[in-house]
């Protein structure tokens, strides 16, 4: 997602 955090945004 784009909101939770940068790691999740990158798909990590």
From Swiss-Prot:
GO cellular component, one term: extracellular region
This protein's UniProt keywords: Secreted
Secreted among keywords: yes
Superkingdom assignment: Eukaryota
Tissue specificity annotation: Expressed by the skin glands.
Localization annotation: Secreted
Broad class of where this protein is predominantly found: secreted
Protein name: Dynastin-3
Organism field: Limnodynastes terraereginae (Northern banjo frog)
């Amino acid at each position: 997602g784009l909101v939770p955090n940068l790691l999740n945004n990158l798909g990590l």
